């Protein structure tokens, strides 16, 4: 596996961040006393939040750091697979449509942050790892790479 690069879908392989994101949106709406109606697409939602709340990312970071343990837990089999791949020379990147702050906190709580070289959008991860990076969208796909 030396020379292999993998681009892992955070939500499909390591940790589903959607419940944490949805809880934060609900909490933020309550705190600012404004009904935050944001698109389901998180990239579009970020733009809407920029307009509605201004500097909302620190609020998300604090909330996610505090609440992530409620939704995100390490998966021993997945983490063992990642450790084995990295030990064999595989480069690992993680992509998500979640804001980077949320993605990095999710990775830490999933126990996978040390194995990951780059976090970002799929385009950013592919640029960092090289265009030949194999996209992995599920734990089953990851298990098949062993």
Residue ranges and their predicted role:
Residues 1-2, 86, 100, 104-146:
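Asp-based, Mg2+/Mn2+-dependent phosphohydrolase catalytic module
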Residues 2-76, 101-104:
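N-terminal helical cap/lid subdomain that shapes the substrate entry/recognition surface
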Residues 60, 69, 81-108:
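Substrate-recognition element of Asp-dependent hydrolases with the DxDx(T/V) motif
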Residues 78-83, 126:
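Short amphipathic alpha-helical segments and helix-helix/interface helices
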């Amino acid at each position: 596996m030396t020379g292999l690069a993998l681009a892992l879908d955070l939500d499909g392989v390591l940790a589903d961040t959607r419940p944490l994101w949805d809880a934060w949106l609900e909490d933020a709406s309550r705190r600012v006393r404004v009904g935050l109606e944001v698109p389901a697409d998180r990239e579009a939602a970020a733009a809407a939040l920029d307009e509605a709340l201004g500097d909302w990312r620190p609020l998300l970071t604090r909330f996610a750091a505090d609440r992530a343990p409620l939704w995100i837990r390490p998966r021993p089999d997945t983490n063992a697979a990642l450790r084995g791949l990295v030990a064999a020379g595989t480069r690992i990147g993680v992509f998500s449509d979640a804001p980077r702050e949320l993605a990095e906190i999710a990775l830490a709580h999933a126990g996978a942050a040390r194995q990951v070289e780059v976090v970002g959008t799929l385009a950013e991860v592919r640029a960092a790892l090289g265009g030949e990076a194999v996209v992995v969208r599920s734990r089953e796909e990851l298990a098949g790479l062993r």
